[in-house]
Amino acid sequence: MFYRNYLLFLLFLLASKVFSTEYEIQAEIVEIDTQKNLIKYLEKVTFNSNEISFKANKVIVNQNNERIDASGSPIELFFRENGEKINGQANKLQIIQNTLFLRDNVIIFRQGNEIKTQEVKIILKEND
């Protein structure tokens, strides 16, 4: 148990260099590829940060190009815009620096409206 918690803490520290924002990822299975500089989180994955939270089947953190890729059926996500909580879902999610991309059967719920599309790009706030 201690080893698993220590490993997850270490992974969090390594992965947190990807973004200027702090975040936490939890998963049933974690795989580290030190040659490709990838961390894979598999099964019941949850991602939480100040800006965005989501649940997915799989998340890959690529430290080479500062990118997070997630997939699910669907991914359930929550984010804030000007203090307003917005819910959504998509089959694919990507975070590159401070930009969130949602792809494949995207649905956004905002102010009682439902927006359906195949792709959405959202600029997240930069941290001070």
List each language-model region with its residue ranges.
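N-terminal amphipathic/hydrophobic interface segments
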Residues: 20-128
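Bacterial N-terminal signal peptides that target proteins for export
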Residues: 1-7
